[in-house]
Amino acid sequence: LVRYPHGGTFEIPILTVNNRSRKCRAILDPNAVDAIGINPKVAEQLSGADFDGDQVVVIPTNSRVKIKNQKPLKGLIGFDPKTAYSTDEKVVNGKTVRVNAAGIPVKIMSKEYKQKQMGIVSNLITDMTLAGAKPEELERAVRHSMVVIDAEKHKLDYKQSEKDNGIAELKKKYQLHTNENGNESTGASTLLSRRNQTIRVPET
């Protein structure tokens, strides 16, 4: 199963087919052409998918079709962004706002900003993976990506996630580069993550 976007092959579960479970067959529609049942543990590996309408791509595997995957990263097991970074409604100075666990008002992510942030964190994960980042560092970036994915829909405190997971530090370590004017900046740093940008190559 592949859910888009995903942080790496550690978020691609490969299922074992079992068509003999009477309990499971009783749940599925007998008229369905194809149907797959999964449990919450499998959904968790799908970059934090839940059962409220998330979609995945099903790829049948055989001797000619082989999908590479890895075991889930330890730091992602049991992590639920909707619990870790939830917010609540509160009336402050006559206005209804969202506050985090510390009671501090937070700004909720818009749909457009979510797309931008997903691009940023996806590029970061790509650059880190290609640079051979440690599993613990990848866990931080992927945890933040899981928060960003659900931030708009579930009104999560993505700013706190950015701090807790040290995203600025990871950007500096894996994406710091100098442009042709000698100015340093962070952002997509490899050919894969910069594929949609115009890159100037200095003459030698």
Could you tell me what each predicted segment is?
Residues 1-59, 63-76, 191-204:
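Core mixed alpha/beta domains of very large multi-subunit molecular machines
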Residues 53, 63, 69-204:
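C-terminal catalytic or substrate-handling cores of phosphate/nucleotide-
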